[in-house]
Amino acid sequence: MFISFEGIDASGKSTVMDLFAKYLKIKFPEKDIVTTFEPGGKNLKEALLIREFLLSKNNQISPYVEMLLFATARRIHLERLIWPALKAGKIVLCDRYIDSSIAYQGFGNGLDIDLVTSLNSLISENTFPDLTIFLDIKISKSFERMGIFRDHNRDRLENKGVEFYERVINGYEFLTKKNKNFFKIDGNGTYDEVLDLIIDFFEKYYASWPK
């Protein structure tokens, strides 16, 4: 089982995903639960170096180069972590995946959507999540969280303006309509409230999966 979590910056993806992993461990005690993130991936030196370069405020790179670097890090992530874990029958939870590239590089940066989609289909060998959970929060709440928790330490992508994030959200709304496995959850509540919404949704969704 492969589940990805999506949303704009400071939407609570990382925190809620970790809480959801604890729930899955109780629901599927016989399964190993792997949590990871993009860009980068846990303990993947090469991909983490790309992450550091991408997020550094000191680097000025074009949207096209940004897209290629994200794709490169994703391929490393797949080869070294995601594919082996799935092959071993583990449950993989990933904070961001291909949909982030479509929303951020495609809609946010204005690159051709078909180009971004085709590139990522190629490098992933059409490996897509069984389920994607999009945490939908207000931009004002995202900015409030970034201001409280990160202050002047925001990375290059987090320093984008409101109009950029409006385009990114439009991208996620597009994916909600386009992908039958892509679902929107209201992320404006507390982490526990959002987790309850996800668990309630997952229980109903999983019950309909072919066994």
From Swiss-Prot:
Transmembrane segments: none annotated. GO terms for molecular function: ATP binding; dTMP kinase activity. InterPro entries: P-loop_NTPase, Thymidylate_kin-like_dom, Thymidylate_kin_CS, Thymidylate_kinase. It is an enzyme of class 2 (transferase). Its EC number is 2.7.4.9. The keyword Transferase applies. ATP binds at residues 7-14. GO terms for cellular component: cytosol. Gene3D superfamilies: P-loop containing nucleotide triphosphate hydrolases. Keywords: ATP-binding, Kinase, Nucleotide biosynthesis, Nucleotide-binding, Transferase. It catalyses: dTMP + ATP = dTDP + ADP. It comes from the Bacteria. PROSITE patterns: THYMIDYLATE_KINASE. GO terms for biological process: dTDP biosynthetic process; dTTP biosynthetic process; dUDP biosynthetic process. Belongs to the thymidylate kinase family. NCBIfam families: DTMP_kinase (TIGR00041). Phosphorylation of dTMP to form dTDP in both de novo and salvage pathways of dTTP synthesis. This is Thymidylate kinase.
